[in-house]
Amino acid sequence: MMKRSNLWMLATILACGLVMASCLDEQIDKPSTTEPEQTSAKDPGKWWINENNMDKTVNPGDNFFMYCNGSWWKNTTIPQGKNYVDQFTNVKPTFQERIGSLDNPNLQTFLTHLKWADDGSEAAIAGQRLYDDVLAQSGLNEAKTKEDVLRAFGRMAAMGVCPGAWLEPMFIDGKVCLYAKYYLEEEMVEPVIDGLDLAIPDQPSLLQMMQDDPSLQSHLVPLAGRSGTRAVPDDCLPLRYIVEGMGFDPKDVYFLDDYYKKKNVQNESIDYSVKRDKRDYNETFSLALSIEKLKKAVLHYYGLDYGFISQKTRAAYDEQYMKENELSPSETSKVGMKALVAVMALNYTSYMNAKVVADQMVPKSLKEEYLKYCEELRTVFAQRIKANEWMSEGSKKNALEKLEAMVFNVGYPDKWVEEALPDLSKSKSLIEDIYSFRKSRVNLLKAIIGKTRQEASFTVMLMNGLPLSKENAEYFSFYNAITIFPYYLLPPRHDPAQSLAINYAYLYVFGHEMTHGFDTNGSQYDKNGDYREGGIWASEADKAEFDRRAGLLVKWFGSFDVLPDEMPGVKAEGKVTLPENIADLGGIEIAWQAYINRLQADGYTGQELKLMKQRFFLAYANEWCAKYGQKHVDYFSFGKERSEGPDPHSLNKERVNGILPNMDDWYDLFGVKPGDKLYLAPADRIHIW
């Protein structure tokens, strides 16, 4: 995936000091003054790449990154306390600041209500009324059977009460269904008290787990019996009745068997099975309980929200909780405002906030423009696959089918679920806000059940807390979808007024994400996003040739000195960065061919055509204009003091110098010849996609 450098982010002005260049290096050809202008099209956009950033003393064939960015590197100081700076570092306002300035009435209402209501205030009275009404409407008190008690609990959850079952979207046979698991006392009650969570289970989503281990799907069991399926165990039957009460068909809801509990018995931190806490959750909603005890268990969950009504109810709840759990006052605290903001933003408001961003920042015309660009790149990619000389027809067929099925999530979802967009205009209290958020989530789940994986991919991502404010573009192999966030659609990342060369060089990002579907990881998944043994390869020979070419890329990138002056002899990491390097190489080649097609269609010829071609490579190098030192290299490339380990991307210099020498046209355009440090003989140039 691409990487550049939780509520909201945006950069809208060009980096300070960037001006339209009056000329380029002597090696870059100018349009002939004797050639009639009408013989060639002219670039109507602005060429704002600053010539003063270049270092003309550097031979392009020795270090193209420094040839394009060397003077900027020399003249730029890394800010104190930082290890990295690029041309967008000091751009103001930032992406987050721009988004934070949007008109978001629901969010403002919620932020206003985060302060606990005074006892007896209008807000406290409204919150208490809602709290009481939900219980009355649920039918819990009138329930005559245990099953009806649990269905009443489900109805309460559909109205916004803290649920006893957590439902997540997932996919079976390519269609959206739901995964259900119990809320755990230890995961829910204590975090609510100490201000760290709002009843959100502290575990990865099932979709994340399935991407880590595709075999997980074989251990999913439906809550309603189907022909040939295993029977629902007694300890999961309560889930069935709860989801029925919420308005879901149990045939669309699954749970995990005990496989993962057994598999991870030696790793207590990883347990994907239906877990029980120290008070034995199996007994909390067990059908073996009497109706009275089962109602009491439901009321316990209902009571978890009581503390959100006012200061008085908060204190009463804290006192009761401490007494039941034998805690001292120092061991618990009231829910903090910042914690509530963070959790709500990530888990309940992301869909609502995404709609605000879409409406106010990404016009439909912009989304449509980029969808056309994506289709343009898809066409080029398909042509390249068909012309591929090392793949068999069977592998080509699989690759083409996967490319054709690939979904382009650009800017925002194609369709919005209005019932999933809360309206807090009449809300007067925090608990009303929370109930509204939870109800909206249930409505969204109902709306996407039965949709195809590709249809629902963007919505599911937003449900799982992926914000549209993310400064990224990503490929998700599980969905076979690329997602282009608004950051990459707006200035300074994209500007329709700038040169065609800059915009097409920038489209490399999109080609990069497409190519991720065919890198060492993505190629293991089929057109539907399902993991397949053997991946897209129709023969072992095709896979072996792919691996051979990938190995050449590892060796090539591993030949670069990361910082020759500061870290002599230290080479770049080629193996860890391989998937990203494959995507970089494929992305730039796809964007380049699309650009050439555009230049030809627009009528560029002669010296003007050559100049436009050169500008594409200059713009690509400018995309990676940055400065960094040893601390950044140690942290970024080698994972020193970085909890997640080395970054999977190459350093900026290698994303230029490691990629472009594999492109034949680059040599002629910049006079690169044998003996230059970056020169690769034609037979040694690496082409994969």
Where does each model-flagged region fall?
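Bacterial N-terminal signal peptides that target proteins for export
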Residues: 1-10
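Bacterial Sec-dependent N-terminal signal peptides
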Residues: 17-42
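Short, Gly/Pro- and small/polar-rich lid/capping loops
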Residues: 38-52
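Active-site-surrounding "flap" and adjacent substrate/cofactor-binding loops of secreted or lumenal enzymes
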Residues: 42-43, 59-62, 67-124
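Functional cleft and adjacent loop/helix regions within the main domain
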Residues: 57, 254-292, 296-328, 332, ...
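Noncatalytic, helix-rich "gating/capping" subdomain that lines the substrate-entry/channel surface
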Residues: 100-377
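Zinc-dependent metallohydrolase catalytic domains
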Residues: 371-507, 516-689
